[in-house]
Amino acid sequence: TFEIIVVMNGCRDDTREVVEQAAAGNRAVRIIEFTQPLGKGGAIWEGLAVANGNRLAFVDADNMVRAPEAEKLIRALDSHDVAIADRFAGVEEGGTSQPPLRKLISRASRLWVRMFLGLPYADTQCGAKAFRIAAWRRIAPRVLERQADNAQ
């Protein structure tokens, strides 16, 4: 079983209606609403704090990571404690492409992370990550809450 938690973070558009319509009759979908913006990191923390289960994942709602890629992310937890999606994977198969300047900045950031931090990961800035609950419990106390949430 699974649950989907949608954190409404000071939204001023029709996001709630879109989510309610898409989730109509699906008891696995839960909406948590905050009238004051928490910021992206705050929304992630609030969603993870109320999540149930032995696997946790979050995906930004900007459509950069499509459902098939999100499924791969979850399946990666079969053999890994943590999984990070890649915004550039799947773009050819219908994912959302970034504007040229944003793409350049994203790729430069990826290069910086690899060169200067020595991390082997392809896309630490991707807004889609998954964790086994035991790994999350070890990692969470070390994360600077609501600060540079993607890079951590």
Report residues per predicted region.
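Conserved donor nucleotide-binding strand/loop of the catalytic core
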Residues: 2-5, 16-50
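A general secondary-structure junction signal
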Residues: 6-8, 86-87
